[in-house]
Amino acid sequence: MKFVYGIHGYGRGHATRSLSILQQLEGHDILVMAGGDAYDLLEPLGYDMFRIPTLAYVYGKRKDRFSMWLSFKHMAPMLWDIFTRGKDYGRIKKRISDFKPDAVINDSEPWTGRSANNLGIPLISVDHYAVLSYGDWDMPGKLKKQLGTTTRIYRFYLGKPDRIIGSAFYPAKPTDSRATLVGPIIRKEVREADITEGDHLLVYFNNQHFFTPEIEKRLTELDVEVHAFVQKIPEDHHNIRFFRSDNCTFVREISSCRSIITSAGNQLAGEALFLRKPMLIVPEASTEQQMNSWAVQNMGVGLETDLDQLASDGFVKEFLERENEFRSRITPFSRDYSPDVAREI
């Protein structure tokens, strides 16, 4: 069969989840449409790629909160292109039409989803946000209220899927007859990794603004080795070693670490649970990440925090002292659902 796979390019989570499915669909003819971080991660792996724009948040002076104005200013021309079927929409739609796929698979990517609807091609949505938009699970009332607006935006700009597959590391029940909800989708490299409990603490933030001088200072005060993934590599100093976020290095480091300090992306949290790694989780200012961080703490597999608390004296040490407590609760959640998703497709 022939598939177009549209992948949202902001951060690595959409790309790593999609990579898991692409690996399950080997032997099929697939055109991958992606931009940003997703394109950078997948293009070296040899997939047939077509670069498209990426909607992304822009951060201002506040390190823990994206700027509404700067983000809108950045995304407005792209949103206008989507809704008016502008130049980028036209070239993406034409490439899909020329490829003649049997279906379009979509991970939170608006141009490919709306093009599929316009061309009358079956649309299969495979992402995390479907769990929030087409699922029901226990959550605080404040987050549930915030979710209503976010869900309406998500459904509006992504198109109308014929089939919905949602993935999350926490349990949820579908509220739509088109929807199937599963647990974490794990890429092949993580599934096959040797899981060890090493001595180093892994630090990875999707938003590099989170790695502030104050947090770096606190990490240097720890009596453990820290392996930090950053975009611009400084020289190693004190107990911190810096790495660039390539696929092989990241899998090696996460599978052998003792625990993780990270932002609250659903995909990384799912991989951490599969590898039985406790998490100290710092959400970005989005409803989805706040829900993920709440779920981590509610499940008892880690702690949620913010940048100020993370930079405070003794907080990371407290987390490290409770590692075994968190790790003991992880085993029931360690399963890979990528074969289930491939069967659904």
What are these regions (language model features)?
Residues 5-19:
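A short, glycine/small-residue-rich beta-strand->loop->alpha-helix junction that serves as a flexible
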Residues 91-148:
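Conserved nucleotide-sugar donor-interacting segment of glycosyltransferase catalytic cores
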